[in-house]
C-alpha cells in the first residue's frame, strides 16, 4: 500500500522524534519474541490450570507452535454500547481456530458510563476508571499464556485504559 506523501513524511518525523524513548519498548518486544511463547515456560501445573476449561483447544494449547490469543472484554449487560461484545469471544475463537490457533477470554474489565452516573454518588469513579481498567487488563494477561491479545471496548475512558495495558502486554 502506498502512503500519501504527507502521511509518509509525518510518520517518518514521528519515528525519528520518538526513537530514543521507543527503543526500550522495541527491545522489550524483541526479547519477548526471541524468548518464544510465554506459556512454554509455565510449570506443568500452571499449564494445566490455564488449559483445563479449553475443551477442544487443550491439545492445541499444549503445543507452542499454535498461537494463543488472549481476549480482554468490557462486555456487560447494562451498557448498550458494550452489548455487542457478548458474542465476540465465540466469533474470535472460531476465526482463530480456523487459522490454526487458539483464543481464550483472559478476563473482563470494569466498564462504566459517566452518562449514567452523572449526578449520582460515585460519579467521580470515572475519573480514575482508566487506571483501574488498565490494571484489570494487565491482571487478566499476567498469566503468561498468551502470544497476543485483542481488547474489546468502547468509550473515552475504557479504550485509553485498554491501550495502556496493551503497551505492556
Give residue ranges: language-model regions:
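Metallocofactor- and cofactor-centric catalytic cores in central/energy metabolism, strongly enriched
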Residues: 1-169
Amino acid at each position: 500500500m502506498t502512503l500519501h506523501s504527507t502521511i509518509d513524511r509525518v510518520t517518518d518525523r514521528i519515528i525519528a522524534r520518538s526513537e530514543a524513548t521507543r527503543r526500550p519498548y522495541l527491545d522489550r518486544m524483541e526479547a519477548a519474541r526471541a524468548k518464544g511463547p510465554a506459556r512454554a515456560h509455565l510449570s506443568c501445573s500452571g499449564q494445566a490450570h490455564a488449559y483445563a476449561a479449553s475443551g477442544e483447544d487443550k491439545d492445541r494449547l499444549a503445543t507452542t507452535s499454535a498461537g494463543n490469543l488472549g481476549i480482554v472484554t468490557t462486555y456487560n449487560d447494562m451498557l448498550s454500547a458494550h452489548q455487542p461484545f457478548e458474542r465476540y469471544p465465540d466469533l474470535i475463537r472460531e476465526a482463530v481456530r480456523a487459522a490454526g490457533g487458539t483464543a481464550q477470554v483472559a478476563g473482563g474489565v470494569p466498564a462504566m458510563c459517566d452518562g449514567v452516573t452523572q449526578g449520582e454518588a460515585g460519579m467521580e469513579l470515572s475519573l480514575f476508571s482508566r487506571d483501574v481498567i488498565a490494571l484489570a487488563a494487565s491482571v487478566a494477561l499476567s498469566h503468561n499464556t498468551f502470544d497476543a491479545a485483542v481488547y474489546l471496548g468502547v468509550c473515552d475512558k475504557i479504550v485509553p485504559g485498554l491501550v495502556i495495558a496493551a503497551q505492556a502486554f
